[in-house]
Structures are given as C-alpha cells and as structure tokens.
Amino acid sequence: MLCLKPGCWLEGEVINVIMEFLTDCERIATRNKAQTWYLNTRMNSEAMGNPLDVKDFIRRHRYQSFFMGPLVHCCKIYVPINPGKHWIVMLVGVDDEVVEIWDSYLYGAKSTGEDLVYDVLTVLDAVLKDEIASTKPSGWSFSKFSIRTPQNVPQQPNLYDCGVFAINIMESRDILELTLGKFHSEDERARLVLKMVMSKFNRKQNTLFASARRHHEMRSGNRICNRA
C-alpha cells in the first residue's frame, strides 16, 4: 500500500485488490451471472509472455472461476494493461464486438497499448474456446473485434497517476471528476487506502485498527502532557 503515498506510481497488486472488490460486488448483484468482468493484471502479464499457453495458469490460480462467469451473460470486460510503466484500461464490448482503449496519457490518435490489446484478445480466445464454440456463432472470435481509442478520456496531470485514473475508469465513476481542476490525487489515493482497509477481504483489519488506536492514544497522551 506504500505505492498509494502521494506522488508514487501504483503497483499492479493495488489494482488487483480493487478488481477483486468489483468482481465480488458484481457477482453478488447478479447472483453469479456476471454481466461485467473485471480481470486483474495477471491477464496482462500472461499475454506479454505466451498468449497461447495460458490454460494451465488459469486452472492453477482458479482465475476463470473467480474473475469470470458464464460467457453467455457477459456484456463487457475490463482489463488493466501495462505496455511499459503506464496503466491503460482495455474495455471489451462483447455484444458490440468492439474494444476501447482508455488511455489517460495519450499522445496522438493511437495508444501505446494497442499491440498488447491483440495479445489479450488472443488469450481470451484461448481461455474461452469451449464456451465460444457453444454460445457464439461460427467464426466468432475476440481477436476479430475492432479496436478504438476514445479521444475524450480525461488526461492525468502528471506522470504517476495512471493507475489511479485506471481504477476510477473501471469503477465507472463520473469521468468528469477526473478532469483538470476536479481531480485531486491525494484525495483519490486516500479514498483507495480507506476502501482497502475497510474491505472484508482485509485479513489484517483488526491488527491495523489496534495499531491505529494505539497511535491515536499515544498522540492524545502527548498532547495532554504538552498542555500540562
């Protein structure tokens, strides 16, 4: 969580924790018939290796059973990708057969993550091969989707907040809040810290609360001594 300190670049594990939150909320809301999938950064890592050799990874880490659901119910898929020290959101529209690359540090019309997008789509084809065959028309494939790079994505005001922007986009928050003058990096980072600490997934919550209580009591005691 130290990477959530002001001015720090976000590590992938912070994004992965948020993906677990979003996945859990979606599964509860849809009774395990998730319409939106939130895949974590390990999908990006596998795609950067060998896109065709992923089934063993998916099986060993129970990736598909947690982060995915029946393909027949899926409408869109969020994938955080990193083509090199920069987090980008890949939004796969399953019904529209369109991929949008949401890049908060865009130069020109093409995102630096476009090449990696093709690899991720190939991974999805490999992992979901059986479901695609049974639920989609003949010849249907993720790798055939058209790719777009929206030009209206709010741009980060610095070099280190791409991960914070990516999380906000995947949370489907109002993107106007990311525009210049409304986005406050330190406030957003504090929000994410609080979200992680208060989460039911936080196994060290009681330890953290006890530590915070001791710190508060010590500070309060020091103030009383100083007044005396």
Protein language model regions, located:
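Cysteine protease catalytic domains with a Cys-His-Asp triad
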Residues: 1-129, 160, 166, 207-228
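C-terminal folded domains that constitute the principal catalytic or ligand-binding module
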Residues: 129-221
